[in-house]
Curated annotation (Swiss-Prot):
It is a multi-pass membrane protein. The gene is TMEM276. This is Transmembrane protein 276. The keyword Heme does not apply. GO terms for cellular component: membrane. Disulfide bonds: none annotated. The chain crosses the membrane at residues 35-55, 63-83, 89-109, 114-134. It comes from Homo sapiens. Keywords: Membrane, Signal, Transmembrane, Transmembrane helix. Residues 1-32 form the signal peptide. Its main location: membrane. It is found in: Membrane.
Amino acid sequence: MAPKPGAEWSTALSHLVLGVVSLHAAVSTAEASRGAAAGFLLQVLAATTTLAPGLSTHEDCLAGAWVATVIGLPLLAFDFHWVNGDRSSANLLLGGGMVLAVAGGHLGPEGRSVAGQAMLLVVAVTILIVAVFTANTYGMWGGAMLGVAGLLSRLEEDRLLLLPKEDVCRWALAVGSWAYCRALHTQRLQWE
């Protein structure tokens, strides 16, 4: 099946926006929240390897997206939980992500897809729960948008809102990452 006109443009733009938002978030959170900054940086690297022509193969791009999902997202949530005193959830999320990263080579493509989506949803739900209890509106929006990205990725449709499904998921991740960066900033202001 031939790609739809504009699909490559849409894909490149969604990767670029996710990369720029994540880079801004990494720089903004680097001093106060190194774990979250590392998670945002992994998203930047995954987007960059996809955008750079000849830099990597399709398999490398998939591996980068896998690492950004199973290690990067738990790193984002780690600091949010840790600062709010929920150290067991923080350690459990990060440990689970590390185990998934190591086990990824033993999973088939469908297994990696399900594990990545599950990790995305678990991170989204835990961020949402902490944000609700701490009344952090940006955290609520960030958790909700990460959850939307995870749920959209499970849909059977190839296109959503006239765009490829993966692009819509990246747009949702970009909005969620921006909101989560703001949530970390708000959280830091509350603790100062």
